[in-house]
Amino acid sequence: MSKRVYEIAKELDLDTKEVIGRLNAAGIEVKNHFATVEDPDYERVFGGGNGRSEAGEERGRKGRQKKRRRVVIDASATNRGPRAAAPSRPSRGRGAAREEAPAAEEREAPEVVRVEPGATVRDLGEALGVPPTRIIQILMGLGEMKTVTQTLSTEEIELVAEELGRRVEVGALEEPAPEEIGPEDSPEDLVEKPPVITVMGHVDHGKTSLLDRIRRTNVVSGEAGGITQHIGAYQVEHEGRRITFIDTPGHEAFTEMRARGARVTDIVVLVVAADDGVMPQTEEAIEHARAAGVPIVVAINKIDVPNANPDRVMGELAERGLTPEQWGGETVTVPVSAKTGEGIEDLLENILVVAELEELRANPKAPASGYVIESRLDPGRGPVATLLLNRGTLHRGDVVLAGTAYGRVRAMFDYTGQRIKEAGPGTPVEILGLSGVPEAGTRFEVAENERAARSRAQQAEERLRRQELAASGPRRTTLEELLGEGGAEELNLVVKADVAGSVEALKEALAKLSTDEVRVNVVRSGVGAVTDSDIMLASASGGIVIGFNVRPTNTAKQVAEREGVEIRTYDVIYKVIEEIEAAMKGMLAPETAERETATAEVRATFRVPNVGTVAGCYVTSGEIRRNNRVRVVRDGTVVYDGQIASLKRFKDDVRTVREGFECGVGIENFNDVKEGDVLEFYEVVEIPR
């Protein structure tokens, strides 16, 4: 195993120039930081501790002292160039010089500049305050040829900074916090808002059926596989008051979507089947609700089935800290039947009671803000986003900013599809007019004007672009680095879906498929049809394209055929997971196993000139094949394992010898075969995984 010079320097806390100097002094020629050093050479030069000199120790101590005083500067706020040196003051004597020494040392402490992964040569130059040409010169000295627009790896960024005597941290820059919208709300401006309810629970426990009964609409029949594929927000009225429901999918593949739902909700309705009890996703939903700090109302569903046992369910809930009110606890528990409608009115009544206790209020006079619940690209209407308002009132014509998407609200629809002009807190609305499809779960707010919204959206897009470049760029450029990964394979995927919620669910599910041997890497994901750009990225990364409820464009099909890129389309998420697992098994190197083909006894040995020792054998079982391997066993111990050099019957070369026949066997590179030895013949077969 070998190490690179910069890895040795980092491991021993030495300067890379010192490492290069020591290696060259020991007669090991290395030219730059990327040069490799074999283990024997490493042990010879640096063995017996870290091999640091006293000067190196002193420099390390000083470096650690300076490290304590580091100042972190974002690349976006760094100075345009190197600081001007402060004019030195005349010394007033030795004592004065000694007093000023610590201050001088403090000034020497290098500032730490934070640089984003995937930064280009130009970006790094701007961050460090040096011309890009200087960066290129340093890289050329390291044996790397780069242009100003090419991205740099983390190692390259760190090495360039070290050459310049600067310190960098490579990591995503913090996204600017959303601007505060006005002063703190005054109590007289606060009004009661509809409670936002998230329905959670185990798959097939009847969440969507329960909402269907409440809404009097049929959602289940429209979902592929009968399972909710993305989040929808709806409102119902009960006793003149509105309640907003969010339906989160229940399968474990949708963990991330459920967690997002819990963040924007006021109350969680936990659906548990009376005949099934608490299941893994039920416990997961409880954890999400507790993490979000929201109250839980339990709906024990399917009380109409013959083997329903609500008391057992209550006992299981009590074991998990949700003691029902009927048992003297604080958890509201309502037995219901989505099929017959029993208990539905009682459930809605209890939800409103809990909402009153929570005192859910918001300021409708403030500029609107909230979260994107769902988004998609509609062929006829363009980007469509479902928003849930937490605060303020959204009007038609307002400029909305949501991550990388922005735009003026051209049209707004309520949960029934009716056009509306404004919407208040706790209300889900569907809007048109955005420049793109925002990610589900993104915070949105009303911007002052389109120019301000465009500027902030471009900043967010630039951050996203850098992250994509860092994720999909060529990370393994040399044969040594490829071999250094232990032969691990990588399955690169481009994921496209009809709605953002499905994209998130797919990414979450695919990430769980990664193993030590095969990594699943989503190089790009998005909403909308599969385009030629997606195909080219998949081709460049050696991956495939996954389309969920979307189809490739005609151009994309042509490009895919030309580039040899496979496009797979699905409408149920479980099919995606199953087929990707199968593809991963095909990528794994096949396992090997030995299969014994024959055994033979050595009854005599013959010395043949120019050939060596030949074993005269009697085949006791099986059939010897010329291409078999042979194992020599003496007194129960294997003394040699190798290839057959020759296989003869009398004086003729043969390809096989069956059981009960005699033959002569020559063994490659082995002449110590003796009478009485046992020869085991076998073949190595590959077992696909």
Curated annotation (Swiss-Prot):
Location of region: G2: 226-230
Binding site for GTP: 201-208, 247-251, 301-304
Region (Disordered): 41-109
Region G5, residue ranges: 337-339
Region annotation (G3) ranges: 247-250
Region entry G4, spans: 301-304
Claim: Endoplasmic reticulum is one of the keywords in the record: no
Any Pfam family: IF2_N
Domain tr-type G: 192-361
Function according to Swiss-Prot or TrEMBL: One of the essential components for the initiation of protein synthesis. Protects formylmethionyl-tRNA from spontaneous hydrolysis and promotes its binding to the 30S ribosomal subunits. Also involved in the hydrolysis of GTP during the formation of the 70S ribosomal complex.
PANTHER family according to UniProt: TR-TYPE G DOMAIN-CONTAINING PROTEIN, TRANSLATION INITIATION FACTOR IF-2-RELATED
NCBIfam families in alphabetical order: IF-2, small_GTP
Protein name: Translation initiation factor IF-2
Organism: Rubrobacter xylanophilus (strain DSM 9941 / JCM 11954 / NBRC 16129 / PRD-1)
